[in-house]
């Protein structure tokens, strides 16, 4: 609350000091506004942390077309390696677990609006390190190319003149943007909303290759019993982490410490071996 001190002795110089006073008042107003904004942000973060601790709810944002990390099972229920990790973490923390499917290209809006508490679905940290409050990486990953087994494509060099498809706003798309010398050789680079569609396009011959996560590629090939292969030369190396809204360190710390305790157990259930890296 600004206070004005005016006396008769200053009346004679009031006109001369008006500009300076205006500048000072403006600075004070700006400082007050900045302080209020910071306090508001702190209150929002505290509220978010409170609702996801002490018997609250853990709302996990995920792509429902990203097996084996998150997808719709044969029984119509959401399942996946990442979702089972999240569910077990919530159980151990005494939180109600809720899997919330999201459009992958809207994930930031969902997180910022508070519709979800975290993004947990094969979420690549590389290139996004400063955008979220992250757990430690819990899994290593690569971006690779998938092609038909009987195609003449055996390396990235063979992709010249070919049609390549990638999920919009994915890590594979980001990796391709970092390799303009490679993408310049493609006949066309297409984007799709999900990898199920991409695999159907590949099966039908509408595209020649898909750029995607190696863990998802291997699972898709196995489940479809399809005659596809993964090229040996990878596009990029990266790591998966759980992303929270910037500043939500309390929930991040609770999730991370719990994840370290049980990630290996869930990994062995899904992959018959421990593929996790957290706590190692």
Regions found by a protein language model. Give the residues of each.
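Bacterial lipoprotein signal-peptidase II cleavage site
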Residues: 18-32
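Ligand-binding clefts/hinges and TM-proximal coupling segments of bilobed small-molecule sensing domains
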Residues: 23, 50, 171-193, 226-231, ...
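Periplasmic-binding protein-like
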Residues: 64, 140-147, 214, 218, ...
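Bilobed "Venus flytrap"/periplasmic-binding protein-like clamshell domains
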Residues: 64-67, 78-91, 123, 144-196, ...
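Short helix-initiation/N-cap motifs at beta->coil->alpha
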Residues: 83, 98-109, 189-204, 238
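Extended ligand-binding regions for polar small-molecule ligands
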Residues: 83-92, 150-153, 162-163, 168-171, ...
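Acidic, polar ligand-binding/catalytic clefts
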Residues: 87, 91, 96-158, 229, ...
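A ligand-binding cleft/hinge motif common to bilobed small-molecule-binding domains
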Residues: 105-106, 122-131, 175-180, 201-236
């Amino acid at each position: 609350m600004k206070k004005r001190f005016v006396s008769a002795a200053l009346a004679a110089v009031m006109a001369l000091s008006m500009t300076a006073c205006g500048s000072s008042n403006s600075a004070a107003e700006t400082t007050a506004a900045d302080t209020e904004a910071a306090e508001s942000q702190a209150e929002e973060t505290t509220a978010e942390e409170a609702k996801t601790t002490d018997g609250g709810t853990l709302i996990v944002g995920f792509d429902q077309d990203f097996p084996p990390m998150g997808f719709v099972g044969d029984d119509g229920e959401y399942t996946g390696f990442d979702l089972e990790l999240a569910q077990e973490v919530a159980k151990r923390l005494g939180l109600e677990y809720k899997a919330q499917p999201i459009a992958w290209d809207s994930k930031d809006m969902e997180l910022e609006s508070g519709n979800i508490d975290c993004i947990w679905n094969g979420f690549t940290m590389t290139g996004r390190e400063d955008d979220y409050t992250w757990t430690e990486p819990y899994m290593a990953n690569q971006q690779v190319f998938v092609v038909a087994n009987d195609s003449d494509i055996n390396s990235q060099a063979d992709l010249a003149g070919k049609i390549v498809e990638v999920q919009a706003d994915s890590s594979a798309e980001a990796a391709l943007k970092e390799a303009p010398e490679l993408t310049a050789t493609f006949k066309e680079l297409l984007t799709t909303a999900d990898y199920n569609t991409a695999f159907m396009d590949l099966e039908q011959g509408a595209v020649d290759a898909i750029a995607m996560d190696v863990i998802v590629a291997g699972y898709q090939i196995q489940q479809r019993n399809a005659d596809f292969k993964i090229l040996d030369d990878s596009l990029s190396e990266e790591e998966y982490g759980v992303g929270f809204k910037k500043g939500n360190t309390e929930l991040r710390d609770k999730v991370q410490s719990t994840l370290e305790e049980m990630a290996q157990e869930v990994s062995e259930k899904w992959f018959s071996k421990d593929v996790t890296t957290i706590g190692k």
